[in-house]
């Protein structure tokens, strides 16, 4: 999703409630805050790294680190998080801006992270099983 797409989505989520800020610096600050919340709660595949020179937010699963997402510079830039988590970012921003539906947006965002994390854990488990099977077939002497 592009930054412009995110702004359009947040605008739609706030219909009849509030509007997004006209000042793009304010919108990017809200996005930065939403990204921070997501990076601290979600096992975002796109944010997982083993490169400790990047700005790290926390430890991830296994040997992975979770890096800080980069903010977009232009409206046409793709958001630096997994596609499914873009909708979570929109909900968190809508919660920050909403006058009447704060809890609804927050709950939808939190639910999106729970569903996303469930999928990621299934993927990581499958990868570990496949690594183990590959190692057994090739006669690895290491753990994998």
Language-model-derived ranges and their functions:
Residues 1-78, 119-144:
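Conserved short "hinge" loops at termini or chain/domain junctions
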Residues 12-15, 93-98:
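Short helix/strand-capping connector loops at secondary-structure junctions
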Residues 24-31, 83, 106, 110-113:
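Generic detection of long, well-ordered alpha-helical segments
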Residues 83-96:
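Elongated alpha-helical scaffolds
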Residues 97-107:
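Short helix-capping/linker segments at secondary-structure and domain boundaries
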Residues 108-124:
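Short secondary-structure subsegments characteristic of cysteine-rich extracellular domains
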């Amino acid at each position: 999703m592009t930054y412009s797409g995110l702004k359009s989505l947040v605008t739609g989520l706030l219909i009849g409630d509030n509007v997004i800020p006209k000042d793009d610096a304010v919108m990017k600050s809200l996005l930065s805050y939403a990204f921070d919340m997501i990076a601290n709660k979600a096992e975002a595949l796109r944010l997982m790294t083993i490169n400790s020179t990047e700005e790290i937010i926390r430890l991830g699963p296994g040997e992975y680190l979770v890096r800080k997402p980069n903010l977009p510079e232009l409206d046409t830039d793709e958001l630096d998080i997994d596609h499914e988590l873009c909708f979570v970012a929109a909900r968190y921003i809508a919660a920050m801006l909403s006058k009447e539906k704060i809890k609804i947006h927050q709950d939808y965002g939190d639910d999106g992270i729970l569903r996303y994390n469930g999928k990621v854990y299934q993927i990581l488990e499958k990868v570990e099983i496949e690594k183990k099977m590959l190692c057994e077939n090739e006669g690895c002497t290491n753990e994998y």
